[in-house]
Amino acid sequence: MRPPADPGARRRATHGRGLSAEGLALLVLMLKGYRPLARRFAAAGGEIDLIVRRGRTIAFVEVKARATLDAAATAIDARKRARVSRAARAWLARHPLAAGATLRADAVFVAPRRWPRHLPNAFEIEGL
């Protein structure tokens, strides 16, 4: 299938695939016992796709959808890690009751016709 010629249409299609991947990632995490706290949290020049909790652990989750799971796994670069870290710090500032929780940055990699791969502690949250 050819991508749409209109850049706006391409952007909307990519956005739609991202939302679908985030929904699938959330379903997988819920099956593992996590409960959602926030979706698409944006603040302080950063964004977090999912924020979930299981017990005393809060995970800030980056979801990456690519053609293969390996391609998705390599898609979280230093710039993206910094943006997630900034947003995580902003979320924590707004939710002081989370102060005693174990915090981590997870990733979920999504590819067509594959079960999503959840990677706990995918990277360090800078500044915590």
From Swiss-Prot:
Q: Which organism is it from?
A: Methylorubrum extorquens (strain PA1) (Methylobacterium extorquens)
Return one GO MF term. nucleic acid binding
Q: What is the name of the protein in this document?
A: UPF0102 protein Mext_0406
Q: Which domain of life is it from?
A: Bacteria
Q: Which Pfam families match?
A: UPF0102
User: What is stated as this protein's family in its record?
Assistant: Belongs to the UPF0102 family.
- Gene3D superfamilies, per this entry? 3.40.1350.10
Q: TM spans, by residue?
A: none
Signal peptide positions are none
